[in-house]
Amino acid sequence: MLEGRILAVSSQTKAVSGIPGAPKRVSFAKVREPLEVPGLLDVQTDSFEWLIGAQSWRERAAALGDNAVSGGLEDILAELSPIEDFNGTMSLSFSDPRFDEVKASTDECKDKDMTYAAPLFVTAEFINNNTGEIKSQTVFMGDFPMMTDKGTFIINGTERVVVSQLVRSPGVYFDMSVDKSTEKDLHSVKVIPGRGAWLEFDVDKRDTVGVRIDRKRRQPVTVLLKALGWTTEQITERFGFSEILMATLEKDNTAGTDEALLDIYRKLRPGEPPTKESAQTLLENLFFKDKRYDLARVGRYKINKKLGLNAGQPIVASTLTEEDIVATVEYLVRLHAGDTSMTAPGGVEVPVEVDDIDHFGNRRLRTVGELIQNQIRVGLSRMERVVRERMTTQDVEAITPQTLINIRPVVAAIREFFGTSQLSQFMDQNNPLSGLTHKRRLSALGPGGLSRERAGLEVRDVHPSHYGRMCPIETPEGPNIGLIGSLSVYARVNPFGFIETPYRRVVDGQVTDEVDYLTADEEDRHVVAQANSAIDREGRFTDSKILVRRKGGEVEFVASSDIDYMDVSPRQMVSVATAMIPFLEHDDANRALMGANMQRQAVPLVRSEAPLVGTGMELRAAVDAGDVIITEKTGVVEEISADYVTVMADDGSRKTYRMRKFARSNQGTCANQRPIVDEGQRVEAGQVLADGPCTENGEMALGKNLLVAIMPWEGHNYEDAIILSQRLVEEDVLTSIHIEEHEIDARDTKLGAEEITRDIPNVSDEVLADLDERGIIRIGAEVRDGDVLVGKVTPKGETELTPEERLLRAIFGEKAREVRDTSLKVPHGETGKVIGIRVFSRDEDDDLPPGVNELVRVYVAQKRKIQDGDKLAGRHGNKGVIGKILPQEDMPFLSDGTPVDIILNTHGVPRRMNIGQVLETHLGWIGKTGWNIQIASDGTRPDWAATLPEEMLSAPADSNIATPVFDGAKEDELTGLLGATLPNRDGEQMVGPDGKATLFDGRSGEPFPYPVSVGYMYIIKLHHLVDDKIHARSTGPYSMITQQPLGGKAQFGGQRFGEMECWAMQAYGAAYTLQELLTIKSDDVVGRVKVYEAIVKGENIPEPGIPESFKVLLKELQSLCLNVEVLSSDGAAITMADGDDEDLERAAANLGINLSRNEAATVDDLAN
């Protein structure tokens, strides 16, 4: 019997993923996974621990046998030290970086706009080389941002994520191109360092070998060899086998080392007088001095591996060596000659082949630790210059390390990276999955990477070496497609930055549970079987020929004795979000991509509900995302409330876990935690104590299980529109809470200090009714757009006083100051309830920016029910907008009277080839109703159930099911289970074995003519809500130049009546409507005021005038020295004056219109 058939037993009732107290899921998995899913945040946390040299990292490195014994900060300080003055008489060196305690907790940092950071100290030693005197001090190097335990950084109160960057690895790369004229194969090689000048060799169409140093002019390669000290005889002895190199040597005019050095100097420094010494120094500095040139450990490793150098030796040199250059030239000429292998100096045989730059053996990850380390290096090099200058200017006797060091460049470099780098991003906190995916993202963009404009198709495409390392499905749809990816579930990053993936070792055709992590290069040397290959109890393959893959993604059938490794899991190749799509194997990749991306846009609902049909990944994803609370020690729940849970541990210690209550996420969604344990309950270490947003019982719960019918309905669900039941609105099934933060500050201005107050000029008492005595709105107040949240007045500029007014003021004292209302108001289109207020004041010693005396934040929560125009989606890329919400009684219903919740159109399935949604619907129905498989009296099962374990023969109603990707429920199992579903209370089985039911029209009660697919599908409410998009304007801000309304909701702009819309008007001959649209409704400044006046007075609309954009066009032409005049029908010139300005301004003043052409920044500015 196959091992795969028995093993599903293990996952039926035991806790999933080794997490105690985990909810039960009935699993269809056939493949036993020997390896636990690794920590999903390890890519972030491990890298940062290496940077700061944490003890946990040192222990891990020792266990892995990694020869790196120092952390990232130690490395960079060692690289910088010693800093010597220009004469070498004194030096300053740094060592022993260490951190103090962090200044404030993560919650306090978010609340007070602080950075979560710890003070960094290093030991600095100043040595006077003349006297031998040593002065040692501990020096403060600034506050260093620390990573939270969730893998994020808190910078100025906002949570940010540093994305890992995919870059070309330093090393040596051989390439081949075809010459267009001669059709010859031309070979070239680039030696790319981590830092420093590039060295390029190539063979041209005349069969000579050339070299380019630092991308300058090409010259014969023998010039470089001679400059390195090689004689013609040595070159002939080493390269005598190569005709092309001998031909190059003949064409080389330089005689000896000196001439070669001068020749190189002339090409690198044209215009400067060449000398032998300066040429020697230049060449040494370019490639052989570690201050200017650094291959990095990974570059040295790659060169050694490619060229077969220093085999078995520890990786030491970070600069180029003479042997590297010679071996590279030899490899190039052998490649051009068509050789397939060469013997390296150490006797190692290495293959000679062209490199694939898109292979994951040649692309590596710069993780967060390395990115920060590079930025610190920039800051320290700036500081180094300052230190050198101070050494020369200060008195030697008085110098101490503290007087030499200026930490400002280092602090500024770190701040610049976290604040402005393309790779330090505002964290996506829409839901726990979006945050987790953001931390596991791989980006080829950013400094030192690609740009989306120049990236071609090859670098964006899926590559065989991505298997198990980067997900082939999850990537954005826009211009970044293929440049941004996501780390696969089991992948990890090795010390060199290459992504490794685990494989089960196969020994003599027997699969063992020993797991090896392989890089893409190592994997190419092996034959790998897939995870679902059939094996027996002993781990031997049952088939004579097994499907395997070899180098380059080629697949073939081979004997079991030829297999080296086997995949550890069927979900090994995909990312976390993709692994949460059930029946992924039945979905087209384009739609699966949309499904993976749209799960990240799910809005947390008021009540979360875990999916009936999951994949078994939901628990690990939710736990590792960090939005649920996990028990640290085994014990008993002592006290519980909505705000906290106290656990008394078995060792006698107490720990209180505080909940986040209705907090605002970065995206304005509601992050709320609630306990799921009871008082007196025993809890294990690692057990989930409290659910967060989008989780239920510790499982990821992004949407709702809804009863779906797949059928057209009166054309209302045409083109992906969705029909919903009114029940979902009334019972708040798809209701979400959104929290907006509004902020205002009171500053010092030139005319005096602004003031937060209730005393606002020209405002009625009704407007101030909900403000307290300070002028701040009360918690619990219902507000709508235009309501005052915080009252604020700003001093106005006072006009010059007349002598009489001055006299009166002198007699009667200070007149009330002139102030204007600059209160914080609810923006256009927003409503809600005030749920929180934070006031920061300089008087209370709060840390505020310069010039700010007081800062007030108001949090407004909005409960958004589902409505027409909101966007819903399944997990298979099946998305749509709600077209109609029907009363419950009008929805189609089943034979027992149950109305369906949602109607999807049948046309959304076949063309898009995402059949997974239909299978999910059927399996959802099976899980909802439960099942019982009939066993014959002699104990025989139906054929389709022969492989199901004992525990799956029956299940109660509302059973949660796991169907893992590439290892889920099969079609015959679904058909059989549909026939075995439990009947309803009337003893009726409403859905047949084909997954279809007779539905009745809710309006007439008549049955529909054909059976309809009915079942439960997991539906997600996306962040694209109609409330955030709908927008209308009557009057508002205008552009300063064209005087046309601005565009976009954010600018309170108008609707653009564009070129094609004008054509439509012309086609229908609607001349007057078109004239009105192009003039008085847009940029006829005079006309629009007169129209306003006419409407107010009830008069006829006046004739339109000349649009402002026409005047702009005239000015444009006049600026080109073209004298353009506008003539009337009788040939008289028309002036472009604005008519009677006085009448216009008088009318505008009477009507309360602001005619100043300033572009208003906000809607509030218009009101002022």
Swiss-Prot record:
Q: Does the keyword Transferase apply?
A: yes
A single Gene Ontology CC term: DNA-directed RNA polymerase complex
Matching entries from CDD domains are given as:
RNA_pol_B_RPB2 (cd00653)
Q: Which reaction does it catalyse?
A: RNA(n) + a ribonucleoside 5'-triphosphate = RNA(n+1) + diphosphate
Q: Which InterPro entries match?
A: DNA-dir_RNA_pol_bsu_ext_1_sf, DNA-dir_RNA_pol_bsu_external_1, DNA-dir_RNA_pol_su2, DNA-dir_RNAP_su2_dom, DNA-dir_RNAP_su2_hyb_sf, RNA_pol_bsu_bac, RNA_pol_bsu_CS, RNA_pol_bsu_protrusion
- Gene Ontology MF term list: DNA binding; DNA-directed RNA polymerase activity; ribonucleoside binding
**Mind telling me which Gene3D superfamilies this protein's record contains?**
2.40.50.100, 2.40.50.150, 3.90.1100.10, DNA-directed RNA polymerase, beta subunit, external 1 domain, DNA-directed RNA polymerase, subunit 2, domain 6, RNA polymerase alpha subunit dimerisation domain, RNA polymerase Rpb2, domain 2
Please tell me whether the keyword Transcription is annotated for this protein.
yes
Keywords of the record, alphabetical order, are:
DNA-directed RNA polymerase, Nucleotidyltransferase, Transcription, Transferase
Q: Which GO terms describe its biological process?
A: DNA-templated transcription
Could you say which EC number(s) this protein's record lists?
A: 2.7.7.6
A Pfam match: RNA_pol_Rpb2_45
Query: What role is this protein assigned?
Result: DNA-dependent RNA polymerase catalyzes the transcription of DNA into RNA using the four ribonucleoside triphosphates as substrates.
The similarity comment for this entry is: Belongs to the RNA polymerase beta chain family.
PANTHER family the record matches: DNA-DIRECTED RNA POLYMERASE I SUBUNIT 2
Its subunit composition reads: The RNAP catalytic core consists of 2 alpha, 1 beta, 1 beta' and 1 omega subunit. When a sigma factor is associated with the core the holoenzyme is formed, which can initiate transcription.
What HAMAP family has UniProt attached to this entry?
RNApol_bact_RpoB (MF_01321)
Instruction: List the protein's name.
Output: DNA-directed RNA polymerase subunit beta
Q: Which organism is it from?
A: Rhodococcus erythropolis (strain PR4 / NBRC 100887)
- Which gene is the coding source of this polypeptide chain? rpoB
